[in-house]
Amino acid sequence: MYFNNELSDLKDHLLRKLQYYTYSDVVRDRINFILWEFKFLDCFLYLKSFPFASECGMLHVSQKMIEIWKSQWNKLIYICMYDEEGSPWDAVVYWKELISQTKQEFRAQYSFPKSPLAANEVIDDDDDDNTHSPEFVMEVIGFFVGNINVLVKINDPCSCFFVPGLKEQIEQILKELKLLRFLVCFVSNKCIVPQYRCTTFYTRALIEASYIAMVAWLYLPIYGNGNQDLAPSEVSRLLSDFMEMKIKSIEPGISRNSIYIDVLQALKSTIPQAQKKHVEIPTHSLTVGLSDQMANLQEMLCLLRDNLIHLPILDLEFHLQDMDSVIVDAGLLIYSLYDIKGQMEDTSLDVINWALGFDLPRNIEPIKVMAYLVMQKAFHCNLPRIHGLGYVDFLLKNLNDFQDCYSDSLAFLKNQLQVIQTEFESLQPFLKVVAEEPHNKLKTLNEDCATQIIRKAYEVEYVVDACINKEALHWCLERWLLDIIEEITCIKAKIQEKNTVEDTMKTVIARTSSKLARTPRMKEEIVGFEDVIENLRKKLLSRTKGQDVISIHGMPGLGKTTLANRLYSDRSVVSQFDFCAQCCVSQVYSCKDLLLSLLRDAIGEESERRELPDNELADMLRKTLLPRRYLILVDDVWDNSAWDDLRGCFPDVNNRSRIILTTRHHEVAKYASVRSDPLHLRMFDEVESWKLLEKKVFGEQSCPPLLKNIGLRIAKMCGQLPLSIVLVAGILSEMEKDVECWEQVANNLGSHIHNDSRAIVDQSYHVLPCHLKSCFLYFGAFLEDRVIDISRLIRLWISEAFIKSSEGRSLEDIAEGYLENLIGRNLVMVTQRAISDGKVKACRLHDVLLDFCKERAAEENFLLWINRDQITKPSSCVYSHKQHAHLAFTEMHNLVEWSASCSFVGSVVLSNKYEPYFHDLSSLHDFSISRILPNFKFLKVLDLEHRVFIDFIPTELPYLRYFSALIDQNSIPSSISNLWNLETLILNRRSADSHNRVLLPSTVWDMVKLRHLHIPNFSPENKKALLKNSPNLDDLETLSYPYFARVKDAELMLRKTPNLRKLTCKVKCLEYLHQYHALNFPIRLEILKLYRSNAFKAIPFCISAPNLKYLKLSGFYLDSQYLSKTADHLKNLEVLKLYYVEFGDHREWKVSNGMFPQLKILKLEDVSLMKWIVADDAFPNLEQLVLRGCQDLMEIPSCFMDILSLQYIEVEDCNESVVKSAMNIQETQVEDYQNTNFKLVLIEKWPKFYKLFSQLSLPRGLVLHLGIESVSSDEKEKKLTVTGDVDADEVQLVVEKLRKCGMPGL
């Protein structure tokens, strides 16, 4: 759009002058207002040459402007171009007055803009073709929309753009223009013939748009001009009259909508395929109140429009022709109604039906059906294909709660919901079977039914929410629930049929031949694992007479089969056996084929054997092997049942027979083991990785020196997985042997490896039970190389409904079983286990597996990652997000940007790329969560990973089950009880604020579903209200960190939490206690951590917890009686940790017989203990003793020498007498009692040793940690060698210390 040349030059010169000045906000607003006016004038002056300009008033305006401005031309030129000393602001003010004057004079001449004439009077076939171009029409309309839209966004009363009281009318104008643009787009992409109808339509659309723009420009805005001639109320009335005039006839007998009807009728016979972006629905004009039927039509079209945006392109195109027909029919219906309504005021529905020649309700019905089907399809196509079996549990609980809380809203659905609830409850036993069944032939059938059931649960939840929030029509929701009931009935029938034929299926379904399951591999030369091979060779050739099973297990791609085949073909091994035979079991196997394979290797091929039954073949094999020493290789065993089918064929006659078994699963390896422990095959180290890569690429030759550095880097990038190394070697072998090519491989390494190795991981994933697939894929929400805290992981699993409940077991225990199952399948690596009970505390995934989880989760609509470097913009993916997907973000700004596109997302997990813990949390930025939460109405998990500060606690998310963040507040709002579904609440504080008390409202005790509550240093806001009115939190299992100022406060809270299993709290201590009051903790409490709130005072109560297993006391004053009295109430205690404890005035601790009978781990750190007296029979089951910073302790009691269960003593930073007594205990344990598992660790801290500790293996099992780079010893020569950044004096200090500790010959 261009202004005429002379005026355009003046405007450009003025703008150049303005850019050199600095202006206030008020002045800048007025300059922007002038520019806004110029944009309209540009367009009007450009369009005035078109024939229709005179018909919409544009020509009159343009001519008037030119006349007025010609009279002022000389003054304009002077101000803008020649007045160098004057301010450009003078020109701005003058131009503003001039434009205002133009508008005012035009409004005075025309009381209202002249209405455009009929189309047949303004359209000439000889018009410029540009007028008929849909692209040009859409460009003009888009310009008008953008310029008018500015008026809606400005809310500042001081702005020139401010339009008080007219926002609704302006939005209606914008809606009219947008519809017009969409309709032009719709027609231009669909209508092929006849072209003349389209040309007429495009010109009519341009006239309508120009006419609307003229009205908007002449009468808006009306504030700040100073000389406006119309009050806001008059402008409002004019705009309303204008909108009404659009449905009236242009002149008698000629309808404004006739052209629209004409072009839509043309579309009826020519509806081609189109893209989704072109499907728009004309709901803008449905404001004419014809009857309830008309309102019904509007609701149908709104429903159709709102759900179309959630359909993927493929599904949309599948239904597009039907939808096109419905949309065109709706358009014909609407414009026909306008046509007749404009001519027949106050017409009844019957008259309109007669006039149009059809039945209005009957014509609305197809639109109604299509709207319902699209709504269902939009929901179904975006559901995840992987589900948690616990989802039905949550739905059943929520149905009761929703019907209680929203009884009025759900009244009309009450009967259907009760039926659905009954049906789901009847299906619970089936879901339990699916969760507990092993892999079998009916697994797929059961899981298909379970998936369908859970999808119905998703639908019910959506329907209930839509009903409560009035987001869908009652008839639609009611019909949907009836359909759900019918579908559940069909699922139940299918389950019943499956149960009826289950026995038949077991005998009929043939097992696939193991030969078809796996192609026999050629003999491979193995590189690496030399230590493993030597260890296994020794086991195979050992002199142990009994049969032994050598089990090798590990993740896919490690080379288990290659390793086993190398041993099986090793001549030094094979020569020691009479028979050697092998078989490959695979996932789906035939027992007959396995037996035939073994018999063929043992005694040769015979075709007649295939006709024998399985039991006769098994007996033949057993008799063949019975008198001989045999070596059997059983490769790729997937479950215990496969081993059970074969084990009876391998007799044990004490002749040193051996079986090599490979499997992916630890439980299978352990199950098959006889004498030797299963071998978990490790990853390659860096040396082995390079050797394998070099061997595969260069064969017997060496790598050229120029390629070695990049080759080493590539080998390291392969993640120590032999399979990945071989895949990369295959790529390098086909490339030129130069650095540039290898650099290119290194840069693109990840995608090549992961894509090629996916099939192997996919096979392990495919056989996972239904309940483990969602748990495994959820690891994709975590970052690479990040150690995952198990407590957090399990709580997330539970909140995501991945865990199926089972009577008599907690969800946490069931989830731990799920995790151990994944670990046993070598899909998850353990990084830390608890010393006391061996439970997993932390884990991680190999990068190959983690990438698989991310990719497969995206394919299954399960998990979407939004990365910092995401190429796709949120605006381009609004329609691609999955309704129930989980989202993982690496940066908070990604979450803010994408939140508007994620209204149906079920969970948001922030996985920050930086370290998981911050020393200074105050450096983090606050985050306004209020900006995004309204977009997440179905949010169930919001895990900000304890690293994002929030400006307020969200309380309007009824589905939320897990919430974790950082807070600044010193109080929690009482409205938090609105989160009545919440199960895990974790709110941490800034490090600087951690000592400030947080007041917890009494309403928290109404959140009866809470299972884990963590808020540092909190106390109840109203203790009386808590005592009298609040219910118990029966489901609460973990509570941290409440502050107890009095024993009564603790008693009160403990009564309200009867099923606690873990409690971490602070208590206010007293100066001194003569008597101890026993505080009864919950019967199920297993872990208790008590911290002091003031320095070294006495605990005001005696702990009584009969099932307590773990106790940590930090910072207390303990007199000689306290621990003795406490021990009487802690008969099952297994772990006792005392930190910063003051042992009375005499600094003495007496432990009598019978105290702590089950204690396994005792740790004392920085305690003021001098004399430790322990009876001979105390600590009868102690396994580990750790002493750190016990500088005053005289010695470790000698009775520890006689504790036969003792396996480990660690002494760090204690005096020399303690070290010497520890060494004496070690000598007695190892030499006198032959306790070969005993280990003594001595750790010394030296002020100048700042480097990492390294280990020194010394005589008699002693291990010394020194803060230096390298330490080695020679036992025979009594020589100690130390390397590192240390001087001779420091080394001498070490030597003297060791001599004093009992090594005088050093």
Curated annotation (Swiss-Prot):
LRR repeats lie at residues 858-881, 921-935, 936-961, 979-1007, 1010-1035, 1057-1081, 1082-1106, 1110-1129, 1130-1153, 1156-1181, 1216-1240. It is found in: Cytoplasm; Membrane. It holds the Pfam family WH_DRP. InterPro entries: Apaf_helical, Disease_R_plants, HMA_dom, LRR_dom_sf, NB-ARC, P-loop_NTPase, R1A-like_N, RX-like_CC. Keywords: ATP-binding, Coiled coil, Cytoplasm, Hypersensitive response, Leucine-rich repeat, Membrane, Nucleotide-binding, Plant defense, Repeat. Signal peptide: none annotated. One of its GO terms (cellular component) is cytoplasm. Residues 407-428, 520-542 form a coiled coil. GO terms for molecular function: ADP binding; ATP binding; metal ion binding. It is a peripheral membrane protein. One of its GO terms (biological process) is plant-type hypersensitive response. ATP binds at residues 554-561. Residues 521-808 form the NB-ARC domain. Residues 1240-1306 form the HMA domain. Confers resistance to late blight (Phytophthora infestans) races carrying the avirulence gene Avr1. Resistance proteins guard the plant against pathogens that contain an appropriate avirulence protein via an indirect interaction with this avirulence protein. That triggers a defense system including the hypersensitive response, which restricts the pathogen growth. This protein is encoded by the haplotype A genome of the allohexaploid Solanum demissum. Belongs to the disease resistance NB-LRR family. This is Putative late blight resistance protein homolog R1A-10.
